[in-house]
Amino acid sequence: MKDETPQFGKKLREIRLKKKLSQGDVSRILGVHRTYISGLERGARNPSLLTVRKIAKALGVNAKILI
């Protein structure tokens, strides 16, 4: 999934901003640190499939949109 991480991060940021959520908002919903969300958006961190599903659920979108 490493090659797809930057695309995932770009989509995550795009959807988060459309929903007017901060990285802090998303991190609180998921119970993770804000820097983790930042790392995902920058492509510095690789999310597991479970994490992708949790993020999709938190944002109210289908996980397929993110990956």
Predicted regions and their residues:
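A short, Lys/Arg-rich alpha-helix, primarily the initiator
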Residues: M1-K18
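Residues within the helices of the helix-turn-helix
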Residues: R13, G24, R53
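DNA major-groove recognition helix of helix-turn-helix/homeodomain DNA-binding modules
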Residues: L50-I65
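Residue-level detection of the helix-turn-helix DNA-binding "recognition helix"
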Residues: L17, G31, R42, R53
